[in-house]
Amino acid sequence: MKKAASIFLRANMTQRDVRLLLQWMENPAVTQYLNEDSTVTTHLRQMECSVPEPMLTYHFNRRSRFFMACTREGEAIGFVKLREQMTGTYEIVYAIGDEALWGRGYGTDAVRSALATAFLKWRAGKVIAKIYPENLRSVRSVGA
Protein backbone atom coordinates (compact mmCIF):
# COMPACT_ATOMS: atom_id res chain seq x y z
CA MET A 1 0.00 0.00 0.00
CA LYS A 2 1.25 3.47 -0.87
CA LYS A 3 2.24 5.53 2.17
CA ALA A 4 1.05 9.08 2.66
CA ALA A 5 3.09 12.05 1.66
CA SER A 6 3.45 14.53 4.47
CA ILE A 7 0.62 16.96 5.04
CA PHE A 8 0.25 20.48 6.37
CA LEU A 9 -2.47 22.17 8.40
CA ARG A 10 -4.18 25.13 6.76
CA ALA A 11 -6.00 27.60 9.02
CA ASN A 12 -7.70 29.66 6.30
CA MET A 13 -11.19 28.28 5.50
CA THR A 14 -12.93 28.43 2.12
CA GLN A 15 -16.41 27.68 0.78
CA ARG A 16 -14.99 24.53 -0.79
CA ASP A 17 -13.85 23.43 2.69
CA VAL A 18 -17.38 23.88 4.03
CA ARG A 19 -18.75 21.69 1.21
CA LEU A 20 -16.11 19.03 1.91
CA LEU A 21 -16.87 19.09 5.63
CA LEU A 22 -20.57 18.70 4.87
CA GLN A 23 -19.83 15.70 2.69
CA TRP A 24 -17.64 14.11 5.36
CA MET A 25 -20.02 14.84 8.24
CA GLU A 26 -22.86 13.18 6.31
CA ASN A 27 -20.84 9.97 5.99
CA PRO A 28 -21.52 7.64 8.97
CA ALA A 29 -18.19 5.87 8.42
CA VAL A 30 -16.38 9.18 9.00
CA THR A 31 -18.48 10.32 11.96
CA GLN A 32 -18.98 7.05 13.83
CA TYR A 33 -16.18 7.84 16.29
CA LEU A 34 -16.59 11.62 16.41
CA ASN A 35 -18.44 13.29 19.26
CA GLU A 36 -19.82 16.08 17.10
CA ASP A 37 -23.13 17.71 17.91
CA SER A 38 -26.00 16.16 15.94
CA THR A 39 -26.72 19.58 14.41
CA VAL A 40 -23.26 19.97 12.87
CA THR A 41 -24.50 19.42 9.30
CA THR A 42 -27.35 21.90 9.79
CA HIS A 43 -24.86 24.45 11.09
CA LEU A 44 -22.50 23.82 8.16
CA ARG A 45 -25.35 24.26 5.66
CA GLN A 46 -26.28 27.58 7.29
CA MET A 47 -22.66 28.72 7.10
CA GLU A 48 -22.43 27.67 3.46
CA CYS A 49 -25.43 29.85 2.60
CA SER A 50 -24.97 32.83 4.89
CA VAL A 51 -21.32 33.37 5.85
CA PRO A 52 -19.12 35.21 3.33
CA GLU A 53 -15.86 33.41 2.61
CA PRO A 54 -13.64 36.05 4.29
CA MET A 55 -15.52 35.37 7.57
CA LEU A 56 -15.40 31.56 7.49
CA THR A 57 -12.06 31.28 9.29
CA TYR A 58 -13.40 33.46 12.11
CA HIS A 59 -16.55 31.34 12.45
CA PHE A 60 -14.63 28.06 12.51
CA ASN A 61 -12.29 29.35 15.20
CA ARG A 62 -14.77 30.84 17.67
CA ARG A 63 -14.68 27.90 20.11
CA SER A 64 -11.51 26.13 19.03
CA ARG A 65 -8.63 26.30 16.56
CA PHE A 66 -9.70 24.62 13.33
CA PHE A 67 -7.44 23.46 10.51
CA MET A 68 -7.90 21.65 7.23
CA ALA A 69 -5.42 18.80 6.78
CA CYS A 70 -3.99 19.18 3.27
CA THR A 71 -1.63 17.26 1.05
CA ARG A 72 1.52 19.06 -0.10
CA GLU A 73 -0.37 19.74 -3.34
CA GLY A 74 -2.96 21.69 -1.33
CA GLU A 75 -5.82 19.16 -1.51
CA ALA A 76 -7.91 19.18 1.69
CA ILE A 77 -8.34 15.59 2.88
CA GLY A 78 -9.43 16.02 6.50
CA PHE A 79 -9.53 18.33 9.48
CA VAL A 80 -7.98 18.87 12.89
CA LYS A 81 -9.55 20.79 15.73
CA LEU A 82 -7.71 21.84 18.89
CA ARG A 83 -10.04 23.00 21.64
CA GLU A 84 -8.61 24.54 24.79
CA GLN A 85 -10.07 22.70 27.80
CA MET A 86 -8.29 24.77 30.42
CA THR A 87 -5.23 26.95 30.32
CA GLY A 88 -2.46 25.02 28.62
CA THR A 89 -4.54 21.88 27.96
CA TYR A 90 -6.08 21.14 24.56
CA GLU A 91 -8.32 18.41 23.23
CA ILE A 92 -7.53 17.23 19.71
CA VAL A 93 -10.25 16.05 17.32
CA TYR A 94 -9.32 14.90 13.83
CA ALA A 95 -10.62 12.98 10.84
CA ILE A 96 -9.53 12.05 7.35
CA GLY A 97 -12.66 12.54 5.28
CA ASP A 98 -11.93 10.35 2.25
CA GLU A 99 -12.21 6.67 3.16
CA ALA A 100 -9.91 5.75 0.25
CA LEU A 101 -7.09 7.55 2.10
CA TRP A 102 -7.55 5.75 5.42
CA GLY A 103 -4.69 3.61 6.65
CA ARG A 104 -2.02 5.51 4.72
CA GLY A 105 -0.59 7.61 7.54
CA TYR A 106 -2.42 10.87 6.83
CA GLY A 107 -4.10 10.85 10.26
CA THR A 108 -0.78 10.26 11.97
CA ASP A 109 0.79 13.15 10.03
CA ALA A 110 -2.15 15.41 10.92
CA VAL A 111 -1.80 14.54 14.61
CA ARG A 112 1.96 15.17 14.53
CA SER A 113 1.48 18.55 12.85
CA ALA A 114 -1.19 19.54 15.36
CA LEU A 115 0.96 18.45 18.30
CA ALA A 116 3.87 20.49 16.94
CA THR A 117 1.59 23.52 16.76
CA ALA A 118 0.19 22.98 20.25
CA PHE A 119 3.45 22.24 22.03
CA LEU A 120 6.00 24.28 20.09
CA LYS A 121 4.00 27.35 19.06
CA TRP A 122 1.39 27.62 21.81
CA ARG A 123 3.51 26.05 24.57
CA ALA A 124 0.69 23.73 25.61
CA GLY A 125 1.32 21.66 28.70
CA LYS A 126 -0.92 18.80 27.61
CA VAL A 127 -2.96 17.62 24.60
CA ILE A 128 -5.63 14.98 25.11
CA ALA A 129 -7.39 12.77 22.56
CA LYS A 130 -10.64 11.05 23.52
CA ILE A 131 -10.53 7.92 21.38
CA TYR A 132 -12.87 4.96 21.35
CA PRO A 133 -10.80 1.76 21.87
CA GLU A 134 -12.43 0.18 18.82
CA ASN A 135 -11.18 3.05 16.61
CA LEU A 136 -7.94 1.23 15.85
CA ARG A 137 -6.65 3.68 13.23
CA SER A 138 -6.86 6.56 15.71
CA VAL A 139 -5.31 4.47 18.46
CA ARG A 140 -2.35 3.83 16.12
CA SER A 141 -2.22 7.51 15.10
CA VAL A 142 -1.59 8.67 18.64
CA GLY A 143 0.61 5.73 19.56
CA ALA A 144 -1.66 4.65 22.41
Regions found by a protein language model. Give the residues of each.
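Helix-loop element at the rim of GNAT/NAT acetyltransferase active sites that forms part
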Residues: Q23-R45
